A protein has these predicted regions:
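Short Lys/Arg-rich amphipathic alpha-helical segments
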Residues: 2-119, 136, 140-142
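Short, surface-exposed recognition loops or helix-turn segments adjacent to catalytic cores
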Residues: 62, 119-130
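C-terminal or internal capping secondary-structure element at the end of a domain, subdomain, or sheet
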Residues: 125-145
Length: 145
């Protein structure tokens, strides 16, 4: 399981021109689910996402997590993160979990996030989404479960 996290000043996701999720300062989390991923992977990755220190403290060092600074978390499913890109000129998606199974694991991750943190918003799994954000930094990290 992969989480591409971006520190943002704000972010929102729309489906068919309707805003389905939005946050102010916090983390935008693009979540990629691979074929072998399990609930345990989701638990491990969520713990890291919520505790990963990417926000500046009083000394301007990255010492604060999204929880420490009471920021928002916007979770967006993105199967393209699981793509194989090492050969050729077209991505392959055989390493991504099948959509039906991925949706269940995505929902588990999202439900766990909501149960463990109070400022969680989300996109819509499998939808054609438009994601708008203002990067802060930019600061972007790829986390693996």
């Amino acid at each position: 399981m992969l989480a591409l996290i971006q520190r943002v000043k704000e972010a929102r996701v729309e489906v068919a021109t309707v805003v389905v999720g939005a946050i102010e300062q916090g983390l935008l989390v693009f979540l990629g689910i691979e074929r072998e991923d399990t609930h345990a992977d989701a638990d491990r990755l969520l713990k890291r996402v919520l505790a990963y220190r990417v926000f500046a403290d009083a000394e301007d060092k990255m010492n604060l997590s999204v929880q420490d600074m009471n920021g928002g978390v916007l979770v967006v499913s993105q199967f393209t993160l699981a793509a194989t890109t090492d050969k050729g000129l077209r991505p392959g998606f055989s390493s991504a979990k099948a959509p039906e199974e991925a949706k269940v694991l995505y929902q588990y991750f999202l439900d766990s996030a909501c149960a463990n943190y109070h400022k969680v918003a989300a996109g819509e799994f499998g939808a054609d989404m438009q994601v708008s954000l203002i990067n802060d930094g930019p600061v972007t990290f790829l986390l693996r479960s």
